[in-house]
A protein has these predicted regions:
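Short amphipathic alpha-helical interaction segments
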Residues: 298-312
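A short, conserved structural fragment
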Residues: 309-321
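Minor-groove-contacting beta-hairpin "wing" of winged helix-turn-helix DNA-binding domains
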Residues: 321-327
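Short, amphipathic alpha-helical interaction segments positioned at domain boundaries
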Residues: 328-343
Length: 343
């Protein structure tokens, strides 16, 4: 916590030296793993440090990710007192063998305890799910969705499992010990999630995110998808301000050493030109419910729009109104849509 607060102080100095006005934070998101493994007092101190440095806008959304095993009423109350308004609980699955495949150690029974603790502290609740783990069936996924809905969260995220190079799971797949994720099964799981959640009153607002209404959407994540500015703190954190993107060194020791010496923890940076910013707008904004303006598609790629409508990937009516908006089929093939529309 002390090192992260040192970076917060460093960022204030950077803005002052650049003659830039400090803006109140409209959203804060504490994630990147399992922050609730930290003592709640340290988490609270970090949030208070950010608030003191920048201020929080009225009605600011302040989210903390949480492992279900670490959330007690006392923890939730302490976080709420520090200004947290929302808790994103890493449920992942309700099925023990799926959790084992994902190498998650929490007890599914603790989801109810964590949700009750968060609600008791007045926090909004989001549940995070992952689908497509080795050995997970469509029936397993249905069980996880039903269990998640039984907790009546304000918001729900469902992400397809991505196999990261260098992980234990990647090595097991390479050796043939476990099967690779099945694309067709993952598509069936996504469609099941969308149908099940819609029937329970949840509306999709981003490819992998659903909420009970507009007020329950994650404003912080929407800021990412809309290409707005953010400042990320911590080892490996990425930031984006006024067309400049930079990222911190990943190793915690190197990160701490740089800040102790009064140096920037940034490992690299790049200025995004108009072409790159246009591509990124298409990549990110096409994922959200309102879509992206068709003006971001270059003139030589506009001809692809008709084909995407014919293939049922984007909404024809929205295209006439000047928007690229994904259909359900388009959400399943979002990357292909972006490839078709980028130079």
């Amino acid at each position: 916590a002390d090192t992260l607060l040192r970076e917060v102080e460093f960022s204030v100095g950077v803005l002052e030296r650049a003659g830039l006005r400090r803006r109140e934070a409209s959203t804060v998101f504490v994630g990147g793993g399992t922050p609730t493994l930290l003592p709640p007092g340290d988490l609270a101190r970090m949030l208070i440090g950010v608030r003191d440095a920048f201020g929080l806008a009225p009605g600011a959304e302040v989210t903390v990710e949480a492992n279900p095993d670490t959330v007690t009423p006392a923890v939730a109350q302490e976080l709420a007192a520090a200004g947290v308004t929302r808790m994103s609980i890493g449920m992942q699955s309700a099925v023990p063998h799926v959790l084992a495949a994902l190498e998650r150690t929490h007890d599914p029974a603790n989801i109810a305890t964590a949700v009750a603790a968060a609600r008791g502290a007045g926090l909004a609740v989001s549940l995070d799910l992952i689908y497509g783990a080795p050995g997970e069936s469509l029936a397993d996924w249905q069980s996880s969705l039903e269990m998640a809905l039984a907790h009546e969260p304000d918001h729900l995220s469902a992400y397809a499992l991505i196999i990261e190079d260098g992980t234990k799971l990647a090595r097991q797949i390479r050796r043939g010990e476990v099967p690779a994720p099945d694309d067709d099964l993952q598509a069936d799981m996504y469609e099941l999630a969308d149908t099940t959640l819609a029937a329970s009153g949840y509306e999709w607002y981003e490819v992998s995110n659903w909420s009970r209404g507009e007020a329950q959407r994650s404003r912080h994540n929407l800021a990412y998808w809309r290409g707005q500015d953010w400042w990320g703190y911590g080892p490996g954190a990425h930031s984006h301000m006024a067309g400049l993107r930079w990222w911190n060194v990943k190793h915690p020791a190197a990160y701490a050493q740089r800040l102790a010496l009064g140096e920037s923890p940034a490992a690299g940076r790049e200025r995004l030109d108009d072409d790159v910013r246009g591509i990124e707008r298409l990549l990110l904004e096409s994922r959200i419910r309102e879509g992206v303006g068709i003006d971001v598609v270059t003139s030589e790629k506009r001809s692809a729009v008709a084909g995407l409508i014919a293939d049922g990937l984007i909404d024809g009516g929205e295209a006439i109104r000047g928007r690229v908006v994904l259909t359900l089929r388009g959400r399943l093939l979002a990357d292909a849509v972006v490839r078709a529309l980028t130079p």
